[in-house]
């Protein structure tokens, strides 16, 4: 079994949510870590773990980012990280998988199923073995205590409950250190 570590320079942990029902706001986490224990070309026996620092959330708008970090949403002061740990992985064929796991946000843990597409393995310019993945899914933010909501004068919802997850990840194979005598 090999260990693969997320390459933070070549990974994006993103999300999209409807704003005012008519447009979409995108954001991402910039500080995170994760690993895969197993074979990236056959995830069915792999174990995947991941964490992200809530304080690293960014949507390109400082005021909105501050609101997301507040107790109205993620409450970063009391819940500084979100985490994911896989519990089951099923192959769908054509390098596609359904990865089920436990997602924890604000001390609330719920099962989530993600769609994972394995992009392949290559050696990079530095001789490292790298695996690529595209991961998508959806959560209902209300289920994790991200419950702030408002309604416009016309009765429109300001922030939708469903949040799309979009992750493009590269993982680097960890080289085993030789035992010293």
Indicate where each model-derived feature is located.
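Low-complexity, acidic/polar, glycine-enriched regions of mature
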Residues: 1-181
């Amino acid at each position: 079994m090999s260990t693969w570590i997320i390459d933070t320079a070549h990974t994006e942990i993103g999300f999209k949510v409807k704003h005012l029902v008519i447009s979409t706001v995108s954001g991402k986490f910039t500080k995170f870590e994760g690993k895969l224990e197993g074979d990236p070309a056959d995830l069915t026996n792999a174990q995947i773990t991941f964490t992200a620092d809530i304080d690293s959330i960014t949507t390109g708008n400082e005021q909105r980012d501050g609101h997301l970090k507040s107790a109205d949403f993620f409450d970063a002061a009391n819940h500084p990280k979100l985490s994911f740990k896989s519990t089951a992985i099923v192959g769908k064929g054509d390098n596609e998988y359904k990865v089920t796991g436990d997602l924890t946000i604000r001390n609330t843990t719920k099962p989530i199923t993600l769609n994972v597409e394995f992009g392949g393995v290559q050696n990079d310019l530095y001789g490292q073995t790298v695996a690529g993945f595209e991961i998508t899914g959806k959560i209902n933010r209300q289920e994790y205590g991200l419950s702030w909501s408002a309604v416009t004068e016309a009765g429109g919802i300001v922030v939708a409950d469903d949040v799309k997850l979009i992750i493009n990840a590269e993982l680097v194979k960890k080289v085993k250190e030789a035992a010293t005598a």
